[in-house]
UniProtKB/Swiss-Prot annotation:
Gene3D superfamilies in alphabetical order: Leucine Dehydrogenase, chain A, domain 1, NAD(P)-binding Rossmann-like Domain
Catalysed reactions listed for this entry: (6R)-5,10-methylene-5,6,7,8-tetrahydrofolate + NADP(+) = (6R)-5,10-methenyltetrahydrofolate + NADPH; (6R)-5,10-methenyltetrahydrofolate + H2O = (6R)-10-formyltetrahydrofolate + H(+)
GO biological-process terms attached to the record: L-histidine biosynthetic process; methionine biosynthetic process; purine nucleotide biosynthetic process; tetrahydrofolate interconversion
PROSITE patterns, sorted: THF_DHG_CYH_2
Keyword line: Amino-acid biosynthesis, Histidine biosynthesis, Hydrolase, Methionine biosynthesis, Multifunctional enzyme, NADP, One-carbon metabolism, Oxidoreductase, Purine biosynthesis
SUPFAM superfamilies listed in its UniProt record: Aminoacid dehydrogenase-like, N-terminal domain, NAD(P)-binding Rossmann-fold domains
One GO cellular component, as annotated: cytosol
Name of a matching Pfam family: THF_DHG_CYH_C
Organism the protein comes from: Acaryochloris marina (strain MBIC 11017)
Record-listed E.C. numbers: 1.5.1.5, 3.5.4.9
Domain of life of the native organism: Bacteria
Name of this protein: Bifunctional protein FolD
Length: 295
């Protein structure tokens, strides 16, 4: 039975609210510490999507008063060159956060490079130490997209305790960390992936469904429990009527009528992800000044 009262989870509006709060925090902290927070973004090559993401981050930094340290390398840059830059940024007292824009060219080992980032400046939350802190439930830098998903759910008063959450996708970027965060919120969590038999049978049991695969239109209305909360993390570019458009993993029009809350693409999880990156940078700025990462 369709749910008529489906509402959009407005990531864009929430992101603006968060960034307004961060601006006020930065002004207070800068007066106390004597400098603004600093974020370094490393990009390799000329991938158009990556370039657009980096521009968005740099503009957001400028709006909030975060110093931006951009490093753009040619596609043929060596591993050692990028590694040395990361080490220099680790040692730079003006830099509080370091982000390596993914994906990287095939000749660069992204996992090895992420290991080189100082865990206390790892604002993408992908260093093994920060992932370990997440597993243990300790304070630390959290992966931005999963943290954004949790912030959206909290903003719309979704009480996760006792609910069944199904996460589709098992990547270290989204699927695994968001599953741990949902578990910490006392949801019962099922992870589904490419080897899950009868995916629809699994997704139809979800009170909260998180799709994080990158396969357009994977989730259709017949796969969704009436009244479910649907979070679409996937984002792909498709040619629609001769124009390139961003689409998610969820077939939005049909699923919207089946769900109680749903994120649009674009305008859902994406804007919150950027805000979580900025929030992580400010958190690192504050913690480095306090000399503690345990609170």
């Amino acid at each position: 039975m369709p749910v008529e009262s489906s509402k959009l989870l407005d990531g864009k509006g929430l992101a603006q609210k968060i960034q307004g709060e961060l601006t006020a925090q930065i002004q207070t902290l800068q007066a106390e510490i004597g400098r603004p927070p600093g974020l370094a973004v490393l990009m390799v090559g000329d991938n158009p999507a990556s370039a657009a993401y980096v521009r968005n981050k740099e503009r957001a930094c400028e709006r909030l008063g975060i110093a931006s340290f951009g490093h753009h390398f040619p596609a043929e840059v060596t591993f050692e060159e990028v590694k040395q830059t990361i080490h220099d940024l680790n040692a730079n007292p003006q830099v509080d956060g370091i982000l390596v824009q993914l994906p990287l060219p095939a000749h660069l080992d992204s996992t090895a490079l992420l290991y080189e980032i100082d865990p206390d400046k790892d604002v993408d939350g992908l260093h093994p130490l920060n992932l370990g802190r997440l597993v243990r439930g300790e304070a630390g830098l959290r992966s931005c997209t999963p943290a954004g998903v949790m912030r959206l759910l909290a903003a719309y008063d979704v009480e996760l305790s006792g609910l069944h959450a199904v996460v589709i996708g098992r990547s270290i970027l989204v699927g695994k960390p968001v599953s741990l965060m949902l578990l910490a919120a006392n949801a019962t969590v099922t992870m589904a992936h490419s080897r899950t038999p009868d995916l629809a049978a699994v997704t139809r049991t979800a009170d909260v469904l998180v799709a994080a695969v990158g396969k357009p239109g994977l989730i259709t209305a017949d796969m969704v429990k009436p009244g479910a909360v649907v979070i679409d993390v996937g984002i792909s570019r498709q040619e629609i009527e001769g124009k390139a458009r961003l689409v998610g993993d969820v077939e939005f029009t049909s699923v919207q009528s089946q769900s109680s809350l749903i994120t649009p693409v674009p305008g859902g999880v994406g804007p919150i992800t950027v805000s979580m990156l900025l929030e992580n940078t400010v958190w690192s700025f504050r913690q480095r000044h306090k000399g503690s990462y345990n609170s």
